[in-house]
Amino acid sequence: MPAENSPAPAYKVSSHGGDSGLDGLGGPGVQLGSPDKKKRKANTQGPSFPPLSEYAPPPNPNSDHLVAANPFDDNYNTISYKPLPSSNPYLGPGYPGFGGYSTFRMPPHVPPRMSSPYCGPYSLRNQPHPFPQNPLGMGFNRPHAFNFGPHDNSSFGNPSYNNALSQNVNMPNQHFRQNPAENFSQIPPQNASQVSNPDLASNFVPGNNSNFTSPLESNHSFIPPPNTFGQAKAPPPKQDFTQGATKNTNQNSSAHPPHLNMDDTVNQSNIELKNVNRNNAVNQENSRSSSTEATNNNPANGTQNKPRQPRGAADACTTEKSNKSSLHPNRHGHSSSDPVYPCGICTNEVNDDQDAILCEASCQKWFHRICTGMTETAYGLLTAEASAVWGCDTCMADKDVQLMRTRETFGPSAVGSDA
């Protein structure tokens, strides 16, 4: 019986030692230690290779991109709309179709006067204002029926046509910008295609509703356009053209702050504005000169031809005059507030704000510094020296000029001549 029972523990030990079939070849100590080491090696080396084939795609990189791109590119719009950003600057990469982004907004990198090749041949700058802002009811901003032709809207793009149109067409709204797509954005929709100039008519591109007004008679009254573009604002009473373009320009400038005219060469109202600006400039210049003369107590006879000198030189001249008037009573008491004297060379008036030199040698006449040819440096030195005496060429040419003088306060004075 003991012989039969002895193999049983050996069988149990072999089953307990490990799962490998080679465990029975060694002793019990070897059977307990070696199978664990073999399992550790199998756990570190074996699973390292199967995950590469189970989870990773095939080693071909093209197949990797296909696996990653197919769920996205085939089901969405990236493949079909990828070439659009390069050809269409108005669309973003993630906007399907031609929707909201490109219809009413202008991207900052696009020129503001470029017409859209997809959303109609008119400009998109003023598109967010669908209702009229004009008191005459004509401020419809580029309706879809107001087309001039194909892309870039080259009709009236030539400046010569713009100039001719500004001379031949009389329009109530005369504050257009010089833009090929915006010259006729606010023309009343009556008198369609009535242009008296055949050259202009030959250059029109036929559109759906090209509305142009011909040179109207002086007594022709303006009728507001009908509500054909879905405008919610009722048309105001009619206004006669004989009221002139000035009132219309004023109304338009007050009613259209963003539509103020920045180009001064578009139409007749610009010419009138130029004339007004010139008149204002002339008036400002006259008022400026009159105020200056009033400040200086000078008669406004318009004989002043010399440019005015800087304020520092004028102050120095005034200082010189005041000093010398106090030093020399025989100078007839001239000061900065007394009337001016004529120049001894150019016979024009010598103002107090000009560089002037007094001939103290003999003739006691005033001379412009520019007329005498004296430089500013020499004039500054002469002005800084209170006891210096300057003589004109005529006085210095005479032999009877007293070259030596004796001053009561300052002693012998320096004799200066500018011949």
Curated annotation (Swiss-Prot):
Signal sequence region: none
InterPro entries the record matches: Wnt_Signal_Transd_Protein, Zinc_finger_PHD-type_CS, Znf_FYVE_PHD, Znf_PHD, Znf_PHD-finger, Znf_RING/FYVE/PHD
Localization per record: Nucleus
A Pfam family the protein falls into: PHD
Alphabetic keyword roster: Metal-binding, Nucleus, Wnt signaling pathway, Zinc, Zinc-finger
Gene3D superfamilies: Zinc/RING finger domain, C3HC4 (zinc finger) (3.30.40.10)
Annotated Low complexity bias: 276-286
This protein's encoding gene: PYGO1
Zinc fingers (PHD-type), renumbered ranges: 340-398
Listed result of changing residue 350 to E: Almost complete loss of interaction with H3K4me2
Interaction with BCL9 as annotated region, ranges: 373-391
Name used for this protein in its record: Pygopus homolog 1
Organism annotation: Homo sapiens (Human)
PANTHER family referenced in this protein's UniProt entry, alphabetically: PYGOPUS, PYGOPUS HOMOLOG 1
